[in-house]
Amino acid sequence: MIKRLLHQINNFRKEAHQKLAVHEAAPSRTVILDDTYRRLSGLSLQQDELLRQSLRCVENQLFRAAHILSWTALIDFIQTKLASDKFVKLNTARPNWNVSSIENLRDNYSEYQMVESCRLVGMINMSEMRVLHGFLSKRNQSAHPSNFFPNYNQTLGFISDILNQIEYLQSKTY
């Protein structure tokens, strides 16, 4: 009897979130984003925590912070992917770099250059590189003084795009 009641409560909660998510400022929209997030597997603990913090920022209307944290999760994912072959392809594509660790990569090269390197090693194509550079631009607008004040919808869209990009990059072998 209790199991049945709990099942009905969970079904009610899911249905309520689906119906409320159509309203522009409804917190239920974050729950829908959680569904996208659950599709991702293979994230590091750090990436997972960064994305969770990003969602918490949305819940607390800290939209610029949410942009920054979700980008940070994506670039960490990219750095880890570049490191997956011990930087062999990266050092071949960028012979002057001589990267030996993720820390070395972070300390010596910009995120813009890292995204360009993803194209050079065959992880992404030119149009995908432009998309990632666009995400970086949004992150920079959020992190530095600017007239960029994202709202709830823009932030959820950005995080959704980041999650979709991670999911896409997870499927890529390069």
PLM region spans:
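Amphipathic alpha-helical interface elements
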Residues: N11, V22-M123, S127-R130, G134, ...
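Residue-level detector of alpha-helical secondary structure
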Residues: L6, N10-R13, H17, Y37
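Charge-enriched, short contiguous segments at helix-coil
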Residues: M1-N11, V121-Y174
